[in-house]
C-alpha cells in the first residue's frame, strides 16, 4: 500500500508518497488545475492497484470538499482528515507534507483497525446528508446574525435622534413599528440609510422564511433530529443543527463522549505535586452546538423541575455560570440517551438519568 500526504493550497497540492517500508517515493507539487490533478491521481491509482491501493492524510481547511470527493473517485482506501498541528519553527509546504506522511505511516496499522491514535486529532467525515444539513443550519445562523446587525443599526439611528421612545410598539419587529419607521421624518442621509436598512431587513426575513421551510422539510428525513425536537424549547432549526452534528451515534461509546465532542468537558493540567484541579471547558468541537445548548438551558429550567432543582443546588455552591455549563453538559448526555435509544424527552431526562438526578437532589 502507498501512503499519500497532501498539504493543500488554492493553486497547488504539495505531495509526499511513502511505501510500506516508510521510504519517500515522491516529493513534488501538483497544480490544482483539473487536467493536472486528474493526471496525477490517475497515475497514482495505476501504481497502487497491484500493492493494495493507497491511503491519504490531509489537514482540514475551508476548501477540502472537492479534493475529498476526488480521492474517493480514484479509489482511496482511507481518508484521514486531521486538525492542523502547531506551526513548526521551520515551516515549508514540503516539510508539512512530510510530517503528515510520517504521521500516517507510523500509525497506519491503528488507523486501518479504526483504533484511536494518541495526539492525532482526527476529523470525522460526515455523510452527504449531514454535511448538507450542517451547511443549511450554518447559513440560517448567519442570516439571523445579519438581520440582528441590521436591527441594531436601525436602533442606532433612533438613539441618535432620541426617537426610540416614540415607537408605537415595545419592539421594532411589528407591522405597526415598520410602518412608523417608513414614515419617520429624518435628515436626508439618515433617511437614506434607514430606507436601505429596511430593505435589508425585508430581504433577511424572506431568506429566513425560505431557509426555515427547507429546514422543516429536511427534518422529516432526519431520525436523530426528530428525537431531539421533543426537548423543551427546541425548534426545527435547533434539532436539525444538533442532529446533523451528532452523525452516527455509534461513534460515541458513552454519554460523556458526546459532551466531550462538543467541548463541554473541563480541561486538566496537573503536573508534579500540584493538586488535582480541573480547569474551564475545552470549547473544542462545534461552537454552534454549544450556542444552541446554552439557549436551551433557559427553556429546560422553566419546564423541568428536576433539572431546575439540580441547577439551583450547583448554583448555590459554584455560581450561576458554572451551573449553566453543568446543565449544558447534562443536556448533551440526555441527547445521547435519546438518540441512541430513540426516546423522546421526559421531565428529568431519560429514565436512567432521571433516577440519578432525582437521587442527587432528593426529589
Where in this protein do the model-derived segments appear?
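A detector of single, family-specific signature residues
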Residues: 1-363
Amino acid at each position: 500500500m502507498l501512503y499519500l500526504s497532501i498539504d493543500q493550497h488554492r493553486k497547488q497540492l504539495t505531495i509526499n508518497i511513502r511505501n510500506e517500508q516508510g521510504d519517500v517515493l515522491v516529493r513534488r507539487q501538483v497544480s490544482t488545475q483539473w487536467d493536472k490533478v486528474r493526471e496525477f491521481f490517475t497515475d497514482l491509482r495505476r501504481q497502487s492497484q497491484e500493492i493494495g491501493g493507497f491511503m491519504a492524510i490531509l489537514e482540514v481547511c475551508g476548501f477540502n470538499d472537492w479534493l475529498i470527493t476526488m480521492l474517493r473517485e480514484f479509489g482511496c482506501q482511507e481518508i484521514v482528515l486531521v486538525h492542523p498541528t502547531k506551526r513548526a519553527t521551520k515551516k515549508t509546504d514540503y516539510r508539512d507534507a512530510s510530517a503528515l506522511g510520517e504521521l500516517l505511516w507510523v500509525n497506519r496499522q491503528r488507523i486501518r483497525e479504526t483504533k484511536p491514535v494518541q495526539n492525532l486529532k482526527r476529523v470525522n467525515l460526515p455523510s452527504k446528508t449531514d454535511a448538507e444539513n450542517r451547511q443549511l443550519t450554518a447559513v440560517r445562523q448567519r442570516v439571523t446574525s445579519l438581520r440582528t446587525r441590521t436591527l441594531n443599526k436601525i436602533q442606532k439611528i433612533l438613539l441618535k435622534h432620541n426617537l426610540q421612545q416614540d415607537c408605537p410598539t415595545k419592539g421594532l419587529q411589528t407591522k405597526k413599528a415598520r410602518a412608523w419607521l417608513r414614515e419617520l421624518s429624518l435628515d436626508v442621509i439618515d433617511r437614506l440609510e434607514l430606507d436601505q436598512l429596511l430593505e435589508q431587513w425585508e430581504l433577511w426575513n424572506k431568506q429566513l422564511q425560505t431557509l426555515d421551510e427547507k429546514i422543516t422539510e429536511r427534518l422529516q428525513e432526519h431520525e436523530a433530529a426528530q428525537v431531539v425536537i421533543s426537548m423543551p424549547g427546541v425548534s426545527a432549526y435547533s434539532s436539525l443543527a444538533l442532529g446533523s452534528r451528532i452523525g452516527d451515534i455509534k461513534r460515541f461509546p458513552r454519554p460523556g463522549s458526546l459532551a466531550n465532542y462538543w467541548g463541554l468537558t473541563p480541561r486538566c493540567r496537573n503536573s508534579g505535586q500540584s493538586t488535582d484541579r480541573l480547569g474551564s471547558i475545552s470549547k473544542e468541537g462545534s461552537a454552534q452546538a454549544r450556542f444552541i445548548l446554552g439557549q436551551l438551558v433557559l427553556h429546560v429550567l422553566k419546564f423541568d423541575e428536576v433539572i431546575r432543582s439540580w441547577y439551583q443546588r450547583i448554583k448555590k455552591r459554584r455560581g450561576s455560570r458554572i451551573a449553566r455549563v453543568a446543565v449544558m453538559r447534562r443536556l448533551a448526555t440526555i441527547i445521547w440517551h435519546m438518540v441512541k435509544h430513540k426516546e423522546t424527552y421526559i421531565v428529568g431526562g431519560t429514565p436512567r438519568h432521571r433516577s440519578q438526578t432525582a437521587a442527587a437532589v432528593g426529589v
